[in-house]
Curated annotation (Swiss-Prot):
Location of this chain's protein in the cell: Membrane
Residues on Extracellular side: 54-83, 139-149
Entry keyword annotation includes ATP-binding: no
Name of the gene: ostc
Transmembrane parts of this sequence: 33-53, 84-104, 118-138
InterPro entries (UniProt xref): OligosaccharylTrfase_OST3/OST6, OSTC
Protein name, UniProt field: Oligosaccharyltransferase complex subunit ostc
Organism the protein comes from: Xenopus tropicalis
């Protein structure tokens, strides 16, 4: 395999370039990278690619028994379709659950006082449990009868 890689370089000669990093380009801090990862996670789980391609409405409407139009946030009985608000709401829940796990991990640091550790554990558990149960509620609204019994 090595000889196969060597074949083009018998004819081609690599240029002797002395490249250096621009002085204005600095390595981003860990918090900046983390913020970019969380924002991209929020956008991807919210279905931003689907929203750009399909261009769904932000909310839908449903006619009630009196003939009035009522706004609805969830596109019921359609697994492969969504309104924009539905995607953003579920994306917020997924991100909140992920942040809850990160908060739970941060509560394990050895130099955290007992009260702060308790508060971090409480906030982390609340975020994880709230996002889990609200995602189940969203699934019941999206697919009525799916998670029953």
């Amino acid at each position: 395999m090595e000889s196969l890689y060597r074949v083009p370089f018998t004819v081609l000669e690599c240029p002797n370039l002395k490249l250096k990093k621009p002085s204005w380009l600095h390595m981003p801090s860990a918090m900046t990278v983390y913020a970019m990862v969380v924002v991209s996670y929020f956008l991807i789980t919210g279905g931003i690619i689907y929203d750009v391609i399909v261009e769904p409405p932000s909310v839908g409407s449903m006619t009630d028994e009196h003939g009035h139009q009522r706004p609805v946030a969830f596109l019921a009985y359609r697994v492969n379709g969504q309104y924009i608000m539905e995607g953003l709401a579920s994306s917020f829940l997924f991100t909140m659950g992920g942040l809850g796990f990160i908060i739970l991990d941060r509560s394990n640091a050895p130099n955290i006082p007992k009260l702060n550790r308790f508060l971090l554990l409480f906030i982390g558990f609340v975020c994880v449990l709230l996002s889990f149960f609200m995602a189940r509620v969203f699934m019941r609204m999206k697919l009525p009868g799916y998670l029953m019994g």
